[in-house]
Regions:
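C-terminal beta-signal and terminal closure region of outer-membrane beta-barrel proteins
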Residues: 345-348, 353, 413-447
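C-terminal outer-membrane beta-barrel translocator/porin domains of Gram-negative envelope proteins
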Residues: 56-57, 73-82, 213-389, 401-402, ...
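Long hydrophobic segments that form regular secondary structure
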Residues: 40-46, 254-256, 389-391
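N-terminal periplasmic "start-of-domain" segments of outer-membrane beta-barrel proteins
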Residues: 6-20
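Gram-negative/organellar outer-membrane beta-barrel architecture
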Residues: 22-242, 247-248, 362, 374, ...
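C-terminal soluble interaction/assembly domains
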Residues: 18-23, 418
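Extracytoplasmic/secreted envelope proteins and their assembly/folding machinery
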Residues: 9, 13, 26-33, 302
Length: 447
């Protein structure tokens, strides 16, 4: 292996499918190129095996794998002025980090790199809102097996903002804090493209005099503990930014404990209990919902599948389908107001205080294909025709045209997979190592 000026040899060697002393296999050479390209540390278009000292009589050959390092770190600096005053963002993501060399002064050029770890921090603040997040990923936990360890921490606090006085009222606040810790293991059966991921996550929601209509209660707290499991298979090749073949799918489940079953309380008569009624005997909905949602009880099933096919020349067709369902173990509790799906728009508005998932469907306004309270079930289909303009390590650029269709529903009994809203449009994507993936789309919704 030559050309790896930053990445350590062992990070590359553990991805190789060709081993010294084995019989030559074209399939293993192709797989090696694919796996090294998927690391994201090298220019996938310039990974070139060089065959040397070919000896047909002895049945031996030397293979030299030529690599070109590409930037793996990203910097995010943003500043702006909006209706809520100044908003500043600082983010750093190091995608080829080395924790073992932190104490080695010589390794700080400018940072200790080369072990394939991911380390990211992000801070955002404004007059009434602040958030902090940290994440770390070790792709080979322990260094011997392809078991990925991940850890993330986050904290968000928002105050009620008065747009007339331009002041934040710190007596009215909403706070979220949480963590996620997980392991992901590369499987051998059915094949070694499969990965099984498992994690435990926890979010703490705390409302203090925060009556905004987002929830039916403005004082109280909620706890969201969930076990997350996902089975995925990714055999796309060769460039992770612009795949030209293969598929990538993920089937996942997010499960909370069945608290009502554990406690032996199904909440069927909660509105009739005196502690949840006013002096006139009328139920107090805010206190009822605070009791129902103190410990969030739900399950969530999702599927995401993408297929890439080279059509002719450099044109590549991407076909994708998405599905999500939020359910409840106890019908008396109903579906939680958190974790819901909001379909429509660019899908970029990830900031949300209620743990919602924004699902892009270009050609429509953000969230316009879901109700105000969010959908509990959705499906989406899309086709993209892509053409690469440049796939250089400094910047990868490709143009695309798309057809999309999807819809969100408030109840499973209303779900109809072909009752969908359609759109079409064009766009362009630009990937620069220092800034990540940038893009712009122009879409039109037909329905």
């Amino acid at each position: 292996v030559v050309g790896n000026t930053k990445t350590n040899d062992n990070v590359i060697y553990r991805e190789l499918r060709i081993k010294p002393g084995e019989l030559y296999s074209k399939d293993k050479v192709v797989r090696t190129i694919r796996e090294v390209g998927q690391l994201g540390f090298f220019d996938a278009e310039q990974i070139s095996p060089d065959f040397k000292n070919v000896d047909p009589n002895q049945g031996t050959v030397d293979i030299e794998l030529g690599l070109v390092e590409s930037g793996a770190s990203q910097i995010e600096l943003q500043g702006g002025y909006g209706g809520g005053g100044f908003i500043g963002t600082v983010g750093l993501a190091f995608n080829n980090f080395s924790t073992k060399n932190i104490k080695n002064r010589k390794a700080w050029r400018p940072l200790p790199m080369g072990d394939g770890q991911t380390f990211a921090i992000r801070l955002q603040t404004s007059t009434f809102y602040s958030t902090r997040s940290f994440s770390f990923v070790e792709p080979w936990f322990g260094g011997r097996q392809p078991v990925q360890f991940s850890l993330s921490l986050s904290s968000t606090k928002q105050y009620r903002y008065d747009y007339f006085t331009r002041r934040a009222d710190k007596s009215q606040s909403f706070e979220i804090a949480g963590f996620n810790v997980g392991l992901a293991k590369r499987l051998r059966v059915p094949d070694d493209y499969f990965v099984l991921s498992q994690s435990i996550s926890y979010q703490y929601y705390n409302l203090q005099n925060y009556f905004t209509g987002l929830f039916t209660f403005g004082n109280g707290e909620s706890h969201n503990i969930a076990y997350n499991i996902a089975l995925s298979r990714n055999n796309t090749f060769t460039n992770p930014i612009f795949p030209v073949g293969g598929s990538n799918f993920t089937l996942s489940a997010r499960l909370s404990p069945p608290y009502s079953l554990i406690r032996g309380d199904d909440y069927a008569d909660i509105a009739e209990r005196p502690e949840y009624q006013d002096n006139s005997g009328n139920p107090i909905q805010a206190e009822i919902d605070q009791a129902r949602y103190r410990w969030l009880e739900f399950y969530k099933i999702k599927f995401d599948g993408s297929w890439y096919t080279r059509l002719f020349g450099k044109f590549v067709l991407k076909a994708q389908t998405d599905f999500g369902f939020l359910g409840t173990y106890n019908s008396n509790l109903g579906n939680i107001p958190f974790e819901r799906f909001y379909l429509g728009g660019d899908g970029m508005q990830q900031y949300a205080m209620d743990g919602r998932e924004t699902i892009a469907l270009r050609g429509y306004e953000n969230g316009s294909l879901s109700s105000r309270d969010g959908s509990i079930i959705y499906n989406k289909f899309s086709l993209e025709l892509r053409y690469p303009i440049s796939l250089k390590p400094t910047a990868s650029v490709f143009a695309l045209s798309f057809l999309e269709a999807g819809n969100g529903f408030d109840d499973f009994k209303d779900y109809s997979p072909f009752d969908i809203k359609r759109s079409a449009g064009i766009g362009v994507r630009v990937f620069m190592p220092a800034f990540g993936l940038l893009g712009i789309d122009f879409g039109y919704g037909f329905d």
